[in-house]
Amino acid sequence: MSTKQKQWTRVEARKVSSSRSGLLALMFLAVGMLSGCGGGSTNSPGTPAPSPVSVSVSPPATSVDQGDTFQFSASVTGNGDQAVTWSVQEGAAAGSITPAGLYKAPAAAMDVHVVVTSVADPSKSSSALVTVRAVSVSLPATAGARFGGQQQFIAVVEGTVVKDVNWSIEEGSAGGTITDAGVYSAPMSGGPFHVTARSVADPSKAATAAVVLTDHGFRMLNSSTLEPRYAHTATLLPNGKVLIAGGISINVDGSSGNLVASAELFDPATETFTATGPMSSARAGHIATLLNNGTVLVTGGRNATAEVYDPATGGFTPVGNMVAERGAHTASLLGDGRVLIAGGQHAGPDAFAIYPVATAEIYDPTTQTFTRVGDMPNKAASHTASVLLEGRVLVAGGYSGSCPGTQDGAAIFDPASKSFSAGASLPGARAEHTATTLNDGRVLIAGGAFEDDCNLDGFIYDTAVVFDPATSSYSPEKKMSEPRYQHSATLLLDGKVLVVGSTADLFDPATSSFAITGGPNVNRADRRATRLADGRVLFTGSTAVAEIYE
């Protein structure tokens, strides 16, 4: 399992008492008196001895990639002269440092000591330990590609500023071809084959992926979305088109832009995108729910507003506000056509913090109003909500807003009583996972992130479990091909579940196991997967490039 790390720094300022000056005055008086008794030639207390010089460097230790730079700072006390000189203790082979304290690491892994020395008192110095990281290359251990199709490989190179790799196929031309950009073209038969990425900075470091050829895989579309976006929604309409709405725009340099109100339609027949809408409000982290009358309810996005899209007119119409503002919530279509909206987070003073809520409400399409129902047992955001075959709703996991950060809590909502009851806890706290109701009524819960904000620790799950409503229990863990969170899970027409991150797996309920399938060509940090009427799956988000799994 891969690890997510966080680092915190606390800086404290302390006020020093001025009583030291009074003590010095008494000392000077005593010296004068003793001097007078001894018949000295002066009654002057004399000049106080200068304070000793000390030098410190910040930070005292750090890690740096090969060839990268790092800025150090120095502090000198006990003397008005703050001038210092910088040096590398191990010499030129261990890197260099400028007079301003900017260190540049060598192209080799090692431990280095950066030394700062006082100009006023060269006998005073301090040093910082620099760990120059070793180069590493990583690829998925196993990847899938379609027979005769293409597959984009992305190698992760760490420990150096040089991220370039050289690609090769262990089996030579019989195993296909691969470009300098990592685009693999598979043969029409055979396999598995082995694709290797070797670091340009350190050719001794490489990684190899076993490529399994399958009948299914991803294909990039010739047309792109009208606006690159993420944190949007993508909803299959009764006419077979897909409504893509809102989200956060992506700038030309790949950075995040602004919340958008724009919307567009994807037509599977022509595989093109056309404008519709826009929404009445810009929003991201919202939820779109297809109602029984064919319209789409759009709720939240860290606000309390809601609106309905009508495919017949191509327009959005605001409806009554929700009881509470929320984003990263869930919205579940109940058997009677109403919508359960649960949990999520609201805005707070810290834009980067999560403020989960436990409140829940129901939207009634006939009155276009929201009514509060019983709260969930726990606050939750980025959780999941799965409608079970008998009509109840399983709510699981999510960010809790308190230690440890993620939770293993689960709850069951009963539409008849409009209330939640505690459910069987997940086998491991998690958020940003997926939960998919299978055709047999069980629920596949896959991946997710565990975060312990109190101990600054966390990891990503590479396993999945199956919840059985009949017994309120979970199956043993099933291994996926990679750790995943913020991924997608889509129920296919044949009853299998397509789980996609940087690679793709198919979960077979009959065997309760995962098998590799052709993977995506685009590396998406945030994606929306929409099953089309013909069984294919549309992928959008993080870029204007769209793909179809078929």
Per-region residue spans from a language model:
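Solvent-exposed segments in extracellular or luminal domains encompassing
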Residues: G101-A108, G182-G190
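Solvent-exposed, low-complexity, repeat-rich "mucin-like" stalks and linkers
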Residues: S58-N79, L139-V161
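Kelch-like beta-propeller repeat domains
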Residues: Q152, T214-E550
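Low-complexity "stalk/linker" and mucin-like segments enriched in Ser/Thr/Pro/Ala/Gly
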Residues: S87-L102, S168-V183
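Extracellular interdomain linker/stem segments of modular secreted and single-pass surface proteins
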Residues: S51-V53, V132-V137, L213-G217
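A short beta-strand micro-motif common to beta-rich folds, especially ectodomain repeats
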Residues: A109-D121, G190-D202
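Bacterial N-terminal signal peptides that target proteins for export
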Residues: K4-L24
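Bacterial Sec-dependent N-terminal signal peptides
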Residues: L26-S56, P122, L129, P203, ...
